[in-house]
Amino acid sequence: MAPKFEWWAKGNNNNTRKGTPVVVKMENPNNWSMVELESPSHDDFLVRTHEKSRNKNARQLTWVLLLKAHRAAGCLTSLGSALFALGTAVRRRIAAGRTDIEISSSGVGSLQKQNHTKKSKLFYSCLKVFLWLSLILLGFEIAAYFKGWSFGTSKLQLQFIFNKGFFDWVYTRWVLLRVEYLAPPLQFLANGCIVLFLVQSLDRLILCLGCFWIRFKKIKPVPKPDSISDLESGDNGAFLPMVLVQIPMCNEKEVYQQSIAAVCNLDWPKGKILIQILDDSDDPITQSLIKEEVHKWQKLGARIVYRHRVNREGYKAGNLKSAMNCSYVKDYEFVAIFDADFQPLPDFLKKTIPHFKDNEEIGLVQARWSFVNKEENLLTRLQNINLAFHFEVEQQVNSVFLNFFGFNGTAGVWRIKALEDSGGWLERTTVEDMDIAVRAHLHGWKFVFLNDVECQCELPESYEAYRKQQHRWHSGPMQLFRLCLPAVIKSKISIGKKFNLIFLFFLLRKLILPFYSFTLFCIILPMTMFVPEAELPAWVVCYIPATMSFLNILPAPKSFPFIVPYLLFENTMSVTKFNAMVSGLFQLGSAYEWVVTKKSGRSSEGDLAALVEKDEKTTKHQRGVSAPETEAEKKAEKTKRKKKKHNRIYMKELSLAFLLLTAATRSLLSAQGIHFYFLLFQGISFLLVGLDLIGEQVE
């Protein structure tokens, strides 16, 4: 007879678990999550029947499934709401958009600008022809795919197709054409671009290794200890030379107050500093506002003067050249230059000027830029990645190992003797900063880059402003290369420096980079989808670009989540850079066009913002509490209220977007996985940029 366990159940009645319940955690009504679910314990089987246990488990499982379904429905609802909101925003921005072709055609400008518009339309027409051709070829390939023809069919296998009809004959001839005539030159061009790509990747890798070596060895420019200690102690024998501060500006009423307040609060003896506000504005309201700001600081005791040119030729270079011709400039030894949106900290001069002491070979000390709006939107985040690599790696490595780098045009201190020895500011290009740096290098002057001295500024927040800035930055170097190549060859600098200047500084980093980036990823890669006999390896399309993007993002580690958008956006910008490079190389009209980068007037971080606020309060107190606003301020406020924001529709980018998406469809038929995903996401990236859905809208 089987033993009875009733006595055991009675003795352990208080300690026996009757089964583990379902524990459900509810953070909010739309977010349910199950934490724990266990089957009844072994002891429960001793006191409860199997039938009750099965019923309870079924009920528990039903509740869990219902909760999971509720959570999934909540996620789908949230996703649908987000997509609907995104679609509404896209529709609203596109409805208010205007194409760049319409805008460029509507404006009446000089003959050079009209010629540039014609060349731009020609480039756009070529892209449209390429797009329509790809759509026709895609139709052929889809028809062939459903007929079951192999995309890699050889000549011998194609002979049986000749008698099947006109379409079969046309497709057969197309395959023979691409095998015998199109694939070989396309593969040759692809191989050439791959070689350029590898050379540029090697250059970037060497720069990164140089940066790692600098960090490992803790190498950085250090001024002589006595010059720093003299400045800190206020010794009468301290190195306190006469310093001229220049702020060139043109119709930049959003930022003039911040920059003027910043330079007027530089920590330097009042008798040894003079501030020049070089206003090239053609707007009377802006001129009045800047004059009033200068007059306010003059009342507060700052040595500041306002200059406005009658003859406004030469853009920024002409403005600086005119200011250097003033008679009192001969009394000054150094000149610090800041753009209108730059806000140096009070100790800027005390950190830069000491590097000149007892070293007559140093002609320039350049500080690093930092950005007050780097997290404003996706566009500013991607720009921050680029510029962080430029300063942390390129400028620092070239400074340490070569004593030469391109002057950034602002946040730098020049020895006036070096400027005069190099020929001063010239208006022959739109990159006057690079021009003077190259000429100073040819005359033997050395440069110092300070990675630990930062000067705050703004990044362009709209794609239109960023696009114009990049066009100027990439067309100017090609102009300069054509003009200064004979001088570089005839100069007395070493062969190694000539090689670095010609092949690395100009050709590789200014010409080859935008050329191969656009040609390889926007032209050759889509063509290889329709001419599969020419191939691009997967490591060229995916692995090496991903590695290079990883290296680029190292100086800005907080931006690591944006590595994929950064890679796609850089390829998207290759259209603008390639167009600018061609304009500068062949002296097209747009290469001579200077457009002031649009500013938003964002305040800097920390004490400077409080300082500006304090200065504004002081000004209001001086005017009187009941004093009315000036006429210029009223007009500026009225003009600001009239401004409306709109979108730009960029037709070239849209054409390339549809071209890449068409090529992605073709690669899907060939089952090329990596190529398909790259073309798909790159096409979407071009589509977003073409519809101006990245960055702020333009006023």
Curated annotation (Swiss-Prot):
| Cross-linked residues, Glycyl lysine isopeptide (Lys-Gly) (interchain with G-Cter in ubiquitin) | 617, 620
What is this entry's stated membrane topology? Multi-pass membrane protein
Per the record, where are the segments of Basic residues compositional bias?
637-646
Q: Is Kinase there in the keyword field?
A: no
Active site, per annotation: 280, 433
What InterPro entries does the annotation carry? Answer: Glyco_trans_2-like, Nucleotide-diphossugar_trans
What are the transmembrane regions?
Answer: 126-146, 194-214, 511-531, 536-556, 649-668, 674-694
Q: In which tissues is it expressed?
A: Mainly expressed in roots, flowers and seeds, and, at very low levels, in seedlings, leaves and stems.
Subcellular locations according to the entry: Golgi apparatus membrane
Phenotype upon knockout? Answer: Normal xyloglucan (XyG) levels. Plants missing several xyloglucan synthases (e.g. CSLC4, CSLC5, CSLC6, CSLC8 and CSLC12) have no detectable XyG levels and several associated phenotypes including reduced stems height and leaves area, as well as shorter root hairs and reduced pollen tube formation ability.
Where in this protein does the record say Phosphoserine is found? 626
Which keywords fit this entry according to its UniProt record?
Cell wall biogenesis/degradation, Glycosyltransferase, Golgi apparatus, Isopeptide bond, Membrane, Phosphoprotein, Transferase, Transmembrane, Transmembrane helix, Ubl conjugation
Q: What is this protein called?
A: Probable xyloglucan glycosyltransferase 12
Q: Which organism is it from?
A: Arabidopsis thaliana
Q: Species lineage, top-down?
A: Eukaryota, Viridiplantae, Streptophyta, Embryophyta, Tracheophyta
